[in-house]
Amino acid sequence: YMKDLPEVKKVYLINQNYSHGQQVSKYAKEMLKRKRADVEIVGDDLAPLAQVRDFAPYIAKIKQSGADSVITGNWGSDLALLIKAANDAGLNNVKFYTYYAVATGAPTALGAAAAGKVYMVGYSHPNHEGPINAIVRGFKARFNDDMYTGSVYHGFSMLTEAFQRAKSTDPVKVAAAMEGMKFKSFNGEVEMRKADHQLQQGLYITRWEKADAKHPLDAENTGHTFVPVKYYEPYVASTPTSCQMKRPS
């Protein structure tokens, strides 16, 4: 997505110092070099996981670097406090590209101040049509909370189909029935790739915006929601695997 944005010229990476954060940093640098060699990496920080209570020093570094974009795999308090610090510092000219900005606590931290500035990549967004829309609304009505983990819908859809195909509830038979399975879900066709049991599915780029008539379901009662701005078909979103899975005999 970023390769098609000429305004992206200087990117700052800030991630959590554990395997996932290290991978986000590694692959962001590799992909930017391959897709947009002109983009300059102006910072690459790894912060201790769930220990930083004030991200103001990191925001000061981002501001000083001249970055126009930030890529972060942060989640939980490490994302909420990062965005809060950016809002508090008035960092209005920098876009944040995230993975987990819809997870509990982050939308409240985003608030109105982050509208138009925070993007998220994921397999879902809050305002799908069809059966999942009713589930999301029902969950909100019953628990006053957001049902943002659409993978639950995938899981039960696939498990139901696998039981029927296997004509059994034996785990080995059900797992075998899942291999290579394709099914229609809320975000298009989803496939359980046989080689590594990873779901192949479409991905959305969404942007934090004020909820409206077209996208009425907000996040954490903020009056804002993640609005899809780009969709990638599964064959585009899919990446190769080197997995050599050992299956039970």
PLM regions and their residue ranges:
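Beta->alpha turn/N-cap motifs
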Residues: 73-76, 98-103, 121-122
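Structural signal for hydrophobic
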Residues: 11, 117-120, 139
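Extracellular/periplasmic ligand-binding modules, especially the Venus flytrap/periplasmic-binding
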Residues: 76-81, 127-183, 199-200
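Venus flytrap/periplasmic-binding-protein-like
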Residues: 47-50, 91-115, 128, 175-184
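Extracellular/periplasmic Venus flytrap/periplasmic-binding protein
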Residues: 1-89, 124-134
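Extracellular/periplasmic catalytic domains that process cell-envelope and extracellular macromolecules
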Residues: 5-6, 63-65, 88-91, 111-114, ...
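Solvent-exposed, acidic/polar segments of extracytosolic/periplasmic ligand-binding ectodomains
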Residues: 182, 186-249
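Cofactor-binding loop segments of dinucleotide-utilizing enzymes, especially the Rossmann-like FAD-
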Residues: 16, 101, 123, 210
